[in-house]
Regions:
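A ligand-binding cleft/hinge motif common to bilobed small-molecule-binding domains
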Residues: 86-90, 214-237
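Extracytoplasmic ligand-binding site segments that recognize negatively charged/polar headgroups
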Residues: 32-39, 76-217
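An extracytoplasmic/periplasmic, membrane-proximal ligand-sensing/linker region
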Residues: 186-187, 286-335
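A bilobed periplasmic-binding-protein/Venus flytrap-type ligand-binding module shared by bacterial periplasmic
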Residues: 132-137, 177, 249-261, 269, ...
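Sec/Tat signal peptide C-region and signal peptidase I cleavage site
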Residues: 19-23
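Periplasmic-binding protein-like
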Residues: 110, 157-164, 191-196, 202-203, 232-257, 269-292, ...
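Early extracytoplasmic/lumenal segment of secretory-pathway proteins
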Residues: 24-89, 211
Length: 335
């Protein structure tokens, strides 16, 4: 009886140890990627790496950046994947991102990566802003299609424009930074003061203004070009317009807590297989051998603003403080 008990206990212990040995290791990944693409990236990674399970923590760029900064002394993220390059530069400066050279880095477009010699972040894609213009609503309201940023300050558009709050949204911040860098400080703030008179509200999501334009809640949304292209493909009555001086950034990946599993997530995120998923939504991706054109995506390259990403990171706190003092009163309530 005793032997049977010992054999049974030993078998149970072996089973438990075997189960633990093969249990997938969880890696906490902070991201600002759009919610509807997270499952696709997770499933693709885990199908090639069944011993690792990605646990996403997702929010908009501004909120995710603030969260990472607040957790600096007790980081909970192991990997940051899909966050704006300017935020990644700031996180590296604060010592939150750790230098790491992933396998396959030589195949990446260098202009999307950390420009410093001790690299800590690598571009997955480039994302762009656009003006999402609802043609049906515009016809009802007799609104002409805007052709320039200055057009959006005309009185005819009063109350018909939505834009992301730059303190919450990286999409919003990169456009604010593009205006300041390309118009100059004084002219940039003066422009935003005029634009604010026509703004219906500021959202806490970079894609929401375009979603609202697609649904006819507003006529115009300053938003993500990729979201506009996707909504148009799905049948929304949108024109996706790119005025001269459109904001853009890289979305990047970096290491917070070094481990074999975390490094494998980063290695896969820059792989050709991962980039073939990115190209479905973004017109420019990190891998040099992956090209294509997202459906209904506008020609953005000719109207891209000149962007200094290091400046975007270093000026971020001051710019957001000034913007919030001037314009935050029109922001939607935070959910």
């Amino acid at each position: 009886m005793k032997n049977r008990f010992m054999k049974g206990s030993l078998a149970a212990l072996v089973t438990l140890l075997a189960g633990n040995a093969y249990a997938a290791q969880e890696v906490t990944v902070y991201t600002a990627f759009e919610t509807d693409i997270l499952a696709k990236y997770k499933n693709a990674f885990e199908s090639e790496n069944p011993d690792i399970n990605i646990k996403w923590v997702r929010d908009s760029t501004g909120i995710m950046t603030a969260k990472l900064l607040a957790e600096k002394n007790n980081p909970r993220a192991e990997v940051v994947w899909g966050l704006a390059g300017s935020s990644m530069a700031l996180l590296k400066e604060e010592g939150i991102l750790k230098p790491y050279t992933p396998h396959g880095v030589e195949a990446l477009r260098s202009n999307l990566n950390d420009p410093q010699s001790t690299q800590a972040w690598y571009g997955n894609d480039a994302f762009f802003n656009a003006v999402c213009f609802n043609e049906v609503v515009a016809k009802q309201l007799n609104l002409p299609a805007p052709k320039s940023w200055d057009d959006l300050t005309k009185p005819i558009y009063k109350g018909h424009i939505a834009m992301p709050n730059p303190a919450s949204s990286g999409t919003g911040y990169m456009q604010v930074s593009a205006w300041l860098q390309n118009m100059g400080e004084d002219q940039g703030w003066n422009y935003m003061q005029k634009l604010d008179q026509n703004i219906a509200h500021y959202t806490h999501s970079g894609s929401k203004p375009c979603v609202q334009a697609g649904m006819g809640e507003v006529a115009i949304g300053i938003s993500m070009a990729s979201r506009g292209a996707k909504l148009k493909t799905q049948g929304a009555p949108l024109s996706v317009i790119t005025p001269e001086g459109i904001g853009w950034e890289s979305e990047a990946v970096g290491l917070v807590k070094p481990s074999d599993a975390a490094q494998r997530v980063i290695d896969w995120s820059i792989s050709k297989a991962a980039n073939e998923l990115y190209i479905e939504m973004y017109p420019v991706v990190g891998h040099q051998d992956v090209t294509g054109k997202a459906e209904n995506f506008p020609n953005v390259e000719k109207n891209m603003a000149k962007m200094d990403f290091a400046r975007m990171g270093s000026e971020r706190a001051d710019v957001l403080k000034t913007w919030s003092e001037k314009f935050d009163a029109k922001s939607e309530p935070k959910s």
